[in-house]
């Protein structure tokens, strides 16, 4: 009986995914990855010379400021980048 109860607890923890995990796209190639603890934003990085094609995607803790050469777009939902 204890084994059954322990099994149910383990299955519940695995299914509920205790501790929300954010999933962000990464580049290259486009695929998603689970962000580590503390990195709760997804980002896209563009070169200012071509704002149509992102050059980098991933997880980040703080959205960087844009510069003369690089623009960042950050968001906080799964695969939003």
Curated annotation (Swiss-Prot):
InterPro entries: Cytotoxin_Cobra (IPR003572), Snake_3FTx (IPR003571), Snake_toxin-like_sf (IPR045860), Snake_toxin_con_site (IPR018354), Toxin_cobra-type (IPR054131). PROSITE patterns: SNAKE_TOXIN. Residues 1-21 form the signal peptide. Disulfide bonds join 24-42, 35-59, 63-74, 75-80. It is found in: Secreted; Target cell membrane. It comes from the Eukaryota. GO terms for cellular component: extracellular region; membrane; other organism cell membrane. GO terms for molecular function: toxin activity. SUPFAM superfamilies: Snake toxin-like. Its main location: secreted. The keyword Signal applies. CDD domains: TFP_snake_toxin (cd00206). One of its GO terms (biological process) is killing of cells of another organism. It holds the Pfam family Toxin_cobra-type. Shows cytolytic activity on many different cells by forming pore in lipid membranes. In vivo, increases heart rate or kills the animal by cardiac arrest. In addition, it binds to heparin with high affinity, interacts with Kv channel-interacting protein 1 (KCNIP1) in a calcium-independent manner, and binds to integrin alpha-V/beta-3 (ITGAV/ITGB3) with moderate affinity. Belongs to the three-finger toxin family. Short-chain subfamily. Type IA cytotoxin sub-subfamily. Monomer in solution; Homodimer and oligomer in the presence of negatively charged lipids forming a pore with a size ranging between 20 and 30 Angstroms. This is Cytotoxin 1a.
């Amino acid at each position: 009986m204890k084994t059954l109860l322990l099994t149910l607890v383990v299955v519940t923890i695995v299914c509920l995914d205790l501790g929300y995990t954010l999933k962000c796209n990464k580049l290259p190639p486009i695929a998603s990855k689970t962000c580590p603890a503390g990195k709760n934003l997804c980002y896209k990085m563009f070169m200012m010379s071509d704002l149509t094609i992102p050059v980098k995607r991933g997880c980040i803790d703080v959205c960087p400021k844009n510069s003369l050469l690089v623009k960042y777009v950050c968001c906080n939902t799964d695969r939003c980048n």
